[in-house]
A protein has these predicted regions:
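Pre-recognition alpha-helix immediately N-terminal to the DNA-recognition helix
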Residues: 10, 14, 25, 41-45, ...
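Short amphipathic alpha-helical segments with heptad-repeat character
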Residues: 12, 16, 20, 64, ...
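N-terminal helix-turn-helix DNA-binding core of bacterial DNA-binding proteins
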Residues: 24-66
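Short, locally clustered residues in the helix-turn-helix/winged-helix DNA-binding domain
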Residues: 16, 44-51, 111, 138
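N-terminal leader segment of winged-helix/HTH proteins
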Residues: 1-33, 80
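Charged, amphipathic alpha-helical coiled-coil/dimerization segments
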Residues: 75-138
Length: 142
């Protein structure tokens, strides 16, 4: 009989292996567009923020993976013309970012390929199994 600790360790290893494989496939897709997973995530966050934009702190708080240097991440996206940033008049330390039309166009071009990839990655699971997986991972997560 497998002990609970062994089952937990096996579950952990399987989650990490699966996540690594899923992200690796997405990385390959994004690489064709000269984007990293982290940059893609930041662009999606800014698209979701809409006209209100988001501060660097807001972006950091919403990232899927912890990103220690959001400022540098946003610098790279701004240099490529995918986002724009502006300092607040009242407090020059406060910087807000918005996605640009070029950034929106890039994401729009990725929406279908990313959705198709996710469908392919989870094709072996039914909708019900996917919903159960999501709930189980939320229970186990931070």
């Amino acid at each position: 009989m497998t002990s609970t600790l062994q089952v937990e360790a096996e579950a952990f290893i399987q989650v990490v292996r699966t996540a690594d494989g899923l992200v690796r496939n997405l990385d390959l897709l994004l690489k064709r567009h000269k984007l990293t997973f982290t940059q893609y995530n930041a662009l999606r966050i800014l698209r979701g923020a809409g006209g209100a934009g988001a501060s660097g702190r807001d972006v950091a708080d919403r990232m899927i993976n912890a990103q220690p240097d959001v400022t540098r991440l946003l610098d790279r996206l701004e240099k490529r013309g995918l986002i724009r940033r502006c300092r607040a008049d009242q407090d020059r330390r406060f910087v807000k970012a918005w996605i640009t039309p070029s950034g929106l166009e890039m994401l729009a071009g990725l929406d279908k390929p990313v959705t198709d990839l996710h469908r392919q990655q989870f094709a072996a699971l039914t909708k019900e199994e996917l919903a159960q997986l999501k709930v189980a991972l939320e229970k186990a997560g931070p």
